């Protein structure tokens, strides 16, 4: 008999969201994600008790790193970045031993600065012991090409594989796995940088994710959410995440300009795609264009180098419009990322557009500094929200109740709020619950 796969829906969304061990409470009409596990590794999940080493050299994929650091802990695992930080050639970003390494778009892992809590650790790979890890993941980007020449890296992968650890790679991350001799004869996938080799030595499949025993491979960055779930299944047979495609038919508008918080845009975009939602980027011009500081350039850049259009997500997965051209009929929920994106919304008068969307009955979600824009649009009176501490005065002066220390995420009517980058998973579950229950 064919197994019935559970799907997240209006009737079970809160129960599914709480399975990780996060506490979800109802306070009047408010639903809040709260307790000590908010923004931290969760106590329950298929990766519970597992230590996952993520091997990176400079020029790694920022997008993949952002998602893994957000979701390994969400499924109960411990993420530790293993830095190939001694290489002095073939990198295009500063690589300082003892400091960390930098991604292709410039995020540094020393550790990732905007991620608090216990979601990440890091050390030089030379100081790590392969016996300490239940799984190793090698990221894509140019990182794999840089590390493949390093004997210490190849020997580390070989030792972990021989001991029975799971080995995973995304995109070009299979380059060191090929060199370590663990891909021969294996069913696998990958991007064009490894496909031609894998077709000769392995059983290549043009699929998003392929699992062959303890080898897990993903084709590209956009497949990272499915890759993480595939790793979960190798540790817990039969695991299926009910979030897969649960938002099919829903439309999410992400409001963006320069100086947005990279992780708060990248991870929601990747997860919303995984959950089946249609993603629309609504862009507006900033008051000042500081990243890059060039007039007339039609590219928006986050605090840590991610751009719109996205460098690592093909445009077939999302669309972009000028926010002024977006109609309320185009979306079901508008999402505001943090950093200085909300500041620009206020400074440019974009909050007037927000007022119109809210008056039309649309749901609005905001994380980190995002509540500042909600307050400026006079949408928080009588509402209870969470967010970064910098939003406190704005929310309270405009009549809202601000609970950043208590809540990781919250739903109050048509307002969804999230605390900081480390609470992106809770924020996304709150968005999912709100959309399913509307």
Regions found by a protein language model. Name each.
Residues 2-163, 175-187, 195-360, 364, ...:
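Extended, subdomain-level signal for the structured scaffold at the beginning of enzyme domains
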Residues 166:
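Active-site environment of divalent metal-dependent phosphoester hydrolases
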Residues 169-173, 367-370:
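Short, thiol/selenol-centered motifs that function as redox-active sites or metal-ligating centers
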């Amino acid at each position: 008999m064919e197994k019935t796969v559970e799907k997240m829906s209006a009737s079970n969304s809160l129960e599914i969201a709480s399975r990780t061990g996060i506490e979800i409470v109802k306070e009047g009409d408010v639903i809040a994600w709260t307790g000590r596990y908010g923004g931290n590794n969760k106590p329950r999940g298929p990766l519970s008790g597992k230590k996952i080493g993520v091997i990176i050299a400079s020029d790694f994929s920022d997008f993949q790193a952002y998602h893994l650091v957000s979701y390994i802990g969400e499924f109960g695992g411990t993420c530790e970045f293993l830095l190939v930080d001694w290489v002095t050639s073939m990198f295009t970003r500063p690589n300082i031993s003892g400091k960390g390494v930098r991604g292709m778009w410039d995020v540094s892992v020393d550790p990732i600065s905007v991620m608090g809590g216990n979601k990440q650790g890091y050390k030089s790979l030379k100081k790590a012991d392969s016996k300490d890890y239940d799984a190793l993941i090698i990221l894509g980007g140019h990182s794999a090409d840089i590390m493949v020449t390093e004997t210490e890296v190849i020997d580390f992968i070989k030792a972990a594989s021989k001991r029975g650890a799971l080995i995973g790679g995304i995109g070009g991350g299979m380059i060191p796995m090929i060199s370590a001799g663990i891909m021969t004869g294996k069913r696998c996938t990958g991007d064009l940088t490894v496909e031609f080799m894998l077709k000769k030595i392995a059983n290549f499949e043009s699929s998003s994710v392929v699992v062959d025993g303890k080898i897990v491979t993903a084709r590209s960055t956009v497949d990272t959410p499915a890759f993480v779930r595939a790793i979960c299944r190798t540790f817990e047979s039969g695991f299926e995440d009910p979030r897969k495609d649960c938002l099919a038919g829903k439309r999410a508008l992400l409001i963006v300009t320069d100086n947005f918080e990279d992780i708060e845009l990248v991870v929601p975009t990747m997860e919303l795609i995984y959950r089946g939602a249609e993603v629309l980027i609504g862009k507006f011009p900033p008051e000042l264009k500081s990243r890059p500081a060039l007039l007339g350039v039609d590219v928006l850049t986050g605090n840590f180098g991610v751009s719109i259009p996205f460098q690592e997500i093909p445009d077939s997965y999302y669309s972009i419009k000028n926010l002024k051209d977006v109609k309320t009929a185009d979306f079901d929920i508008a999402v505001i990322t943090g950093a200085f994106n909300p500041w620009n919304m206020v400074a440019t008068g974009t909050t007037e557009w927000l007022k119109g969307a809210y008056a039309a009955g649309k749901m609005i979600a905001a994380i980190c500094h995002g509540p500042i824009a909600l307050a400026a649009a006079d949408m928080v009176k009588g509402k209870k929200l969470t967010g970064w501490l910098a939003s406190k005065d704005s929310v309270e002066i405009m009549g809202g109740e601000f609970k950043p220390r208590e809540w990781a995420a919250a739903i109050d009517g048509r307002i969804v709020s999230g605390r900081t980058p480390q609470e992106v998973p809770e924020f996304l579950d709150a968005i999912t619950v709100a959309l399913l229950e509307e």
